[in-house]
């Protein structure tokens, strides 16, 4: 069984009789000597959908669950439901808007390549996105000529409604690459 410091976003733990899907992990390093590093993890309870927060020491042993991952394509929206189609056997997977609210901030219209659904024992758990996505800037303050030497940032609204910090020299209409997990600008898209 792995230790708490080996847990990554998207893994599922069997903890206190609950199946918990890791959504976010904060690492808190201690200032006192001999104190253990704490891992504050935010989970989504697979069965109830409720948000759960737990703290672990780095060397705590946790019980993980092996998931089935299937590559999918975005198919269509039906009211409040988003339907994804399995790339191999064309099985439809349906999520409500609430279940994938975070993921929708990074998903361009028409979907994106390398999306996966996570299932366990025939139960649909989560939608997993690739590490990066290319999105277009739709709104930001105008670019400042000669600002490429400065390291200042400004907020930019992207085509999906997501707001992130970008360098000052970028302007609306440009496509940029975003690191999804860290919600950070990586560079201009090819």
From Swiss-Prot:
Matching CDD domains: S1_EF-P_repeat_1, S1_EF-P_repeat_2
GO CC annotation: cytosol
Family matches, as Gene3D superfamilies: 2.30.30.30, Nucleic acid-binding proteins
One example GO MF annotation: translation elongation factor activity
GO biological process, one term: peptide biosynthetic process
Similarity section: Belongs to the elongation factor P family.
Annotated PANTHER family: ELONGATION FACTOR P (PTHR30053), TRANSLATION ELONGATION FACTOR KOW-LIKE DOMAIN-CONTAINING PROTEIN (PTHR30053:SF14)
NCBIfam families from the UniProt entry: PRK00529.1 (NF001810), PRK04542.1 (NF003392), yeiP (TIGR02178)
Protein name: Elongation factor P-like protein
Origin organism lineage: Bacteria, Pseudomonadati, Pseudomonadota, Gammaproteobacteria, Enterobacterales
Encoding gene per record: yeiP
């Amino acid at each position: 069984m792995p230790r708490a410091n080996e847990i990554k976003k998207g893994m599922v733990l069997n903890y206190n009789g609950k199946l918990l899907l890791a959504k976010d992990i904060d690492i808190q390093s201690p200032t006192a000597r001999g104190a253990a590093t704490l891992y504050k993890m935010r989970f989504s309870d697979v069965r109830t959908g409720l948000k759960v927060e737990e703290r672990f020491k780095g060397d705590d042993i946790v019980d993980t669950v092996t998931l089935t991952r299937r590559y999918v394509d975005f198919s269509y929206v039906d009211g409040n439901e988003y339907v994804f189609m399995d790339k191999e056997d064309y099985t439809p997977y349906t999520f409500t808007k609430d279940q994938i609210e975070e993921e929708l901030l990074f998903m361009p219209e028409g979907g994106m390549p390398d999306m996966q659904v996570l299932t366990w024992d025939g139960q649909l758990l989560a939608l997993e996105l690739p590490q990066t996505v290319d999105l277009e800037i739709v709104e930001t303050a105008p670019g400042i000529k000669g600002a490429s030497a400065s390291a200042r940032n400004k907020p930019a609204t992207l085509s999906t409604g997501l707001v992130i910090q970008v360098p000052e020299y970028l302007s609306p209409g440009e496509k940029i690459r975003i690191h999804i997990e860290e919600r950070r600008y990586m560079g201009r898209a090819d």
